[in-house]
């Protein structure tokens, strides 16, 4: 249907997405404009940053910034990402029980909405691990070695995975025995909000949560990969072991056979309950059994009331687990949602389209750039001048069986052209190659080839030919 599957070139270096699906094209254009309106180039005391908090606070908080970071890279906001993550890393301190500042404003101060003193401040305990995971993902996208070796980052990673865990009683075996009153100080304003063991903030007597456990898993898994890249193999193995302990705890104690999903909260009266905390269990890959992923997704989809913050995660999540039509519906309708101006929304839609629908996933640790289209309907989609590593790439998909790739970076790249389906062959510029096979998280077969693409070169791959 799509003939030669040609990748047309965009002559300048402006990021541009185009598609025969005008709904996706319109959503990307809206999200790109909205997200870029939140970006600041360095004119403020805090340095380069983008808004990642409630609008009009002129600030960025740990959860929002971590989630928005890949969308920001897609928009070319690398300087902002590094500066913001470094601000979080550099402000970790013993006086805050190894927390950092939850939210930092453009004047380079802890945001007054969340901070009075080191004894009296708001803090969600997931946050340290969320930032570690974000820094790993930023390294994978950019190849920036500073996320691995910078002294302030390494100090933050090490303290978060050791002293922080000890101080707040956050080991897996402590999840069902810890007190909500750990490290409670005499702060008059924030009280027990100095150390909320969840990203769900409306629950009072909660001692631990599934979303915290999922985030801790993600943080330790990322820490393990960071140490591996630094050739610290013993530390990497230990961190991976700790990550797996969180996963096993989640599976052993939090899974409900009756509900076929995870409980979300553990109360101080020794009981479980359910709520909106499952997003981060999936976001951080804390579940590896396809049946349990499916049960969790289905439970989430049955829930009718979600805040816009959670919804901003859903396109990337649903594409990851093969629910492409549900992801597509959100992308098409988000422009009509209430509170769509919340910064996470536009950044999340950008990631959902580029990393979800187009399946573009750079991996500096493996030296590869993966593409895996999940287009709904018979459409083409193309992105030009996408910032990756040390330069730009362009990618086009024609339906879900033909992809083209142009390398505009300064060095040759390995492109893994992947397609859903069990194909015997994939053609590369008309030459037939034996397809390699792997499975996704749900056990679905993916066929792929790996192509070395030199500087300035373009290649086209088509499945089933």
What are the functions of these language-model segments?
Residues 14-34, 88-101, 139-210, 238-241, ...:
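Active-site acid/base region of carbohydrate-active enzymes
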Residues 76-149, 154-184, 305-314, 322-349:
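Helix-terminus loop motifs that line ligand-binding clefts
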């Amino acid at each position: 249907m799509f003939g030669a599957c040609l990748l047309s070139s965009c002559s300048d270096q402006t990021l541009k997405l185009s598609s025969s699906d005008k709904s996706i094209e319109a959503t990307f254009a809206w999200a790109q404009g909205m997200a870029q309106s939140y970006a600041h180039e360095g004119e403020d005391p805090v340095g380069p940053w983008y808004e990642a908090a409630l609008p009009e606070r002129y600030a960025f908080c740990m959860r929002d910034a971590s989630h928005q970071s890949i969308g920001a890279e897609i928009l070319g906001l690398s300087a902002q990402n590094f500066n913001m993550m470094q601000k979080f890393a550099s402000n970790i301190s013993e006086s805050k029980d190894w927390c950092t500042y939850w939210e930092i404003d453009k004047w380079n101060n802890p945001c007054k909405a969340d901070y009075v003193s080191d004894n009296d401040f708001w803090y969600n305990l997931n946050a340290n691990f969320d930032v570690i995971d974000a820094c790993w993902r930023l390294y994978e996208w950019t190849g920036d070695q500073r996320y691995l070796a910078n002294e302030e980052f390494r100090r933050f990673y090490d303290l978060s995975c050791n002293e922080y865990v000890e101080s707040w009683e956050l080991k897996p075996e402590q999840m069902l025995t810890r007190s909500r009153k750990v490290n409670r100080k005499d702060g008059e304003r924030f009280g027990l909000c100095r150390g909320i063991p969840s990203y769900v903030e409306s629950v009072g007597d909660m001692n631990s949560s599934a979303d915290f456990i999922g985030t801790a898993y993600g943080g330790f898994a990322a820490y393990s990969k960071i140490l591996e890249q630094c050739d610290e193999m013993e530390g990497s193995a230990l961190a991976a072991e700790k990550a797996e302990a969180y996963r096993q705890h989640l599976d052993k104690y939090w899974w409900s056979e009756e509900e076929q999903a995870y409980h979300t909260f553990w109360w101080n009266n020794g009981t479980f309950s359910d709520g909106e905390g499952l997003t981060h269990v999936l976001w951080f890959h804390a579940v590896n059994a396809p049946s349990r992923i499916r049960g969790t997704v289905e439970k989430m989809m049955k829930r009718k009331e979600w805040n816009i913050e959670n919804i901003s995660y859903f396109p990337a999540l649903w594409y990851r687990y093969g629910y492409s039509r549900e992801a597509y519906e959100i992308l098409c309708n988000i422009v009509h949602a209430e509170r769509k101006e919340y910064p996470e929304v536009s950044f999340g839609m950008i990631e959902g389209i580029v990393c979800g629908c187009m399946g573009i996933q750079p991996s500096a640790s493996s030296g590869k750039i993966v593409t895996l289209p999940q287009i709904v309907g018979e459409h083409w989609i193309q992105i030009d001048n996408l910032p990756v590593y040390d330069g730009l790439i362009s990618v086009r998909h024609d339906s879900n069986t033909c992809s083209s790739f142009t390398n505009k970076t300064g060095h040759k790249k390995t492109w893994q052209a992947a397609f859903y389906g069990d194909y015997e062959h994939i053609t590369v510029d008309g030459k037939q190659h034996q397809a390699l096979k792997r499975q996704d998280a749900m056990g679905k077969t993916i066929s792929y080839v790996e192509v070395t693409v030199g500087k300035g070169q373009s290649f086209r791959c088509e499945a089933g030919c």
